[in-house]
Amino acid sequence: MHNIVCIKQVPDSAQIRVHPVTNTIMRQGVPTIINPYDLFALEAALGLRDRFGGEITVLTMGPPSAEESLRKALTYGADRAVLLTDRCFAGSDTLATTYALATAIRKIGKEYGPANLIFTGKQTIDGDTAQVGPGIAKRLGVGQLTYVAKVRSVDVANETIEAERRSEGGVQVLHTRLPCLITMLEATNQIRRGAMADALRAARAKIVKWSAQDAGVEDISKCGLKGSPTVVKRVFAPPARAERAALVESAEQPAQALIDAIFLNQPKLETDLATLARDARSGLSGQC
């Protein structure tokens, strides 16, 4: 089997900055990580390789600094890494991103053999659109299984796959033919730790780097901001809120504070309760 895993280097969401003119995320100087859902996708691919053998190629599109995330993926056990990097890709929305990645996946198929499965995370934590995986499948003309929790089985000879998808009503069991694209939810198994041998291999590995021309991109106008019809009207970070803490010396204090807060927001409630208490006392006095 040859499986391709698309990963993305994403900024630390706690330190995101936004360009005031283009409304795109400014990634320079911001700490980055591999998108967590993409790690779940990588773990699913590694699990299949454990069972069926084969190779795993990890692919990302981004600036030269994205090489760091690819090397991290190699430490988990991926066999090779491809970095699609070109200034013309800057500012890509999901439509432009899927065009570039689908083009690179076709090139990977020619260079290293066609993919049986293509994995992505269900979404990225910086965009949260969940559009890239399905968009790649559409451009490649392959089937897709989205929000997959577990790959149950793969029949390589008959080119079929069975997987589980979580839904509000329970678990759906899905069947489709290979090749197909899978977007993964949280991993059902814990993400493995890379072995020391994998870490050493990753440090020495040569990352394959392709420009738009190298990957076979035929229409540059479909890339980057030029190829992105999505208009972001405003991007902003929520204002930071100061956390306040109270020193509690007895169990009665928080209870009294809660009562005071309720009465402050609903002043009529205190009056109504006082009236009920007075009426109750009057009733008891009348019975004596």
UniProtKB/Swiss-Prot annotation:
GO terms for molecular function: electron transfer activity. InterPro entries: ET-Flavoprotein_bsu_CS (IPR000049), ETF_a/b_N (IPR014730), ETF_b (IPR012255), ETF_beta_N (IPR033948), Rossmann-like_a/b/a_fold (IPR014729). Keywords: Electron transport, Nitrogen fixation, Transport. One of its GO terms (biological process) is nitrogen fixation. The keyword rRNA-binding does not apply. Pfam families: ETF. It comes from the Bacteria. The keyword Electron transport applies. Coiled coil: none annotated. Belongs to the ETF beta-subunit/FixA family. This is Protein FixA. It comes from Bradyrhizobium diazoefficiens (strain JCM 10833 / BCRC 13528 / IAM 13628 / NBRC 14792 / USDA 110). The lineage of its organism: Bacteria, Pseudomonadati, Pseudomonadota, Alphaproteobacteria, Hyphomicrobiales.
